[in-house]
Amino acid sequence: MESDFYYIELFEIYKGLLTETQRETFYSHYFLDLSLAEIAEQQKSSRQSVFDAVKKVKSKLTEYEKELKIKATESEILSIAESVSDKALKERLKSAVGK
C-alpha cells in the first residue's frame, strides 16, 4: 500500500484529470485534514460514500501514473540531475521538472 504522501504527489500531477467533486473530496481529506464524517456532512452523504470516493480517486491516480508515468519520469530526471557534475545542466534538469 502506498503512503498518503505518494497519493498527494500524484494528485498534484493529475488533479486536472479528475472531476470537480473528486478533486474537492480528495483535497478536503488530505489537504484540509477533514475526517470522512466531516466531508460526508458537508456533502450531505454518508461516510461510506466518501470513503468509497477517496478510494476511487486513489485508484484513478494510480491508474494515471501507471499509464502516463509522469511521476516516475520526474523522479528519474531528478536522480540523473543529482549524479551530474555540471552545475548548469543539473539546474536545467531540476528546472525542467519544476524543482
Task: Indicate where each model-derived feature is located.
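Short amphipathic alpha helix immediately N-terminal
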Residues: 20-32
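Helix-turn-helix/homeodomain-like alpha-helical modules used for DNA recognition
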Residues: 80-99
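Short Lys/Arg-enriched helix C-cap and helix-to-coil transition segments
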Residues: 62-75
